Amino acid sequence: MAQKPSIPKGTRDFSPEEVAKRNYIFNTIQTEFKGFGFQPIETPSFENSSTLMGKYGDEGDRLIFKILNSGDFLKKADKDALANSDSLKLTSSISEKALRYDLTVPFARYVVQHQNEIEFPFKRYQIQPVWRADRPQKGRFREFFQCDADVVGSNSLWQEVEFVQLYDAVFNKLGLEGVTIKINNRKVLSGFAEVIGEQDKLIDFTVALDKLDKIGEEGVKKEMREKGISEEALNKIQPIFNLNGNFAEKIEGLKTILEGSETGQKGIEELQFIQNAIEEMPLSVAKLDLDVTLARGLNYYTGAIFEVAAPENVKMGSIGGGGRYDDLTGIFGLKDMSGIGISFGLDRIYLVLEELGLFPATVTENTKVLFINFGEKEALYAMKAVKRLREENIIAELYPDSAKMGKQMKYADKRSIPYVVLAGEEEINDKKFTLKHMKSGEQSNLDFNGLSGALK
């Protein structure tokens, strides 16, 4: 019995309709990227493991897909690691390459490798797939596209302002209202760790804090205790959990909490600059909100942190995110190169637009007219018209076989082709075409110019 074909969990096939809708999102994002002055690049689907490992924290490293070395990889495997079931040590001896986890670290590698060819500040966008060995769930896949925009070579806070505007511009074009752009600052998080005397546990602290929405206040505190953060420190951070109000009110609360931290106060100043600029240039469909628990458990953000939440009436995780990473290129030997970037979560944006019915009907339009095939002579006459229509940017097809007319009409109906053309011996003699509207059944006898005009 033949094996039933399947695809790996966390991956998907896409139908023509789905591809058309995805391309609508891609094109919308790409148009705005270009409008904001970003240039496109592409990087390989896999990188050297040394490029990726250690850049995303322990959690991220575990989600990187490793690629086995070519040939008999076990010959060069670490025998002690194999005997002792030491998976980490064994992996490094049998795998030297890995599928990219995101587009940001490969971009940092690109900048360092091509620094002599780049004009700084360098604004780039990149739309390519990434892979993560995550547990699949709604809106979370093991293979998915990221749509990134980054700027390197400038530490100006106007870049942060511009990225907020970029998010808003894209969601405005997609007709997606009610999106919340959450913002925080890594310096604020460092300030929290400083005022409670736990600077050495900053990563543990922020990773736990970032889970507040998922596991609640008590869950966060429990995880912090497990990481060795003292009860006294937990009492000091209680005001963080009680911080609420609008952006300005939260800022005032932060000033009190971080009164003893110079780093934290610097983070507050940066947040205020961004908020003041956005107030002067109001957003169209999105809302900017300060979320002091937002940490995005990655190792490379050093300033602003962004996360985009879908409208409240849609149950969905984040649909975008990013931040400033002043030290990212430093890991590849290029020091003092400040950068900031954001990413759009295409797959989740797709699900949100689908759920809210926001895809325009025109997105899935394909062939405009199908010519019925009555035989070789008629097919040649039809094909000449098809060629001319295509030259006028009208999508036209000839049914390939001279099958029964009912079968051809059914084919047009199943594919939602709005028009069919009948061109038999009579039409050929008169140099005409019979155009039929599939829904209404209305027919018109037209010359080519009339046919072309009716289809435009």
UniProtKB/Swiss-Prot annotation:
EC number, as in UniProt: 6.1.1.21
GO molecular function, one term: ATP binding
CDD domains: HisRS-like_core (cd00773), HisRS_anticodon (cd00859)
One biological process term in Gene Ontology: histidyl-tRNA aminoacylation
One GO cellular component term noted in the UniProt record for this chain: cytoplasm
Cellular localization per UniProt: Cytoplasm
Main location: cytoplasm
Top enzyme class: ligase
Annotated keywords: Aminoacyl-tRNA synthetase, ATP-binding, Cytoplasm, Ligase, Nucleotide-binding, Protein biosynthesis
Catalysed transformations (reactions): tRNA(His) + L-histidine + ATP = L-histidyl-tRNA(His) + AMP + diphosphate + H(+)
InterPro entries tied to this protein: aa-tRNA-synth_II, aa-tRNA-synth_II/BPL/LPL, Anticodon-bd, Anticodon-bd_dom_sf, His-tRNA-ligase, HisRS-like_core, HisRS/HisZ, HisRS_anticodon
Family stated for the protein in its record: Belongs to the class-II aminoacyl-tRNA synthetase family.
HAMAP family, sorted: His_tRNA_synth
Subunit relationships: Homodimer.
Name of the protein in question: Histidine--tRNA ligase
Organism: Christiangramia forsetii (strain DSM 17595 / CGMCC 1.15422 / KT0803)
Source taxonomy: Bacteria, Pseudomonadati, Bacteroidota, Flavobacteriia, Flavobacteriales
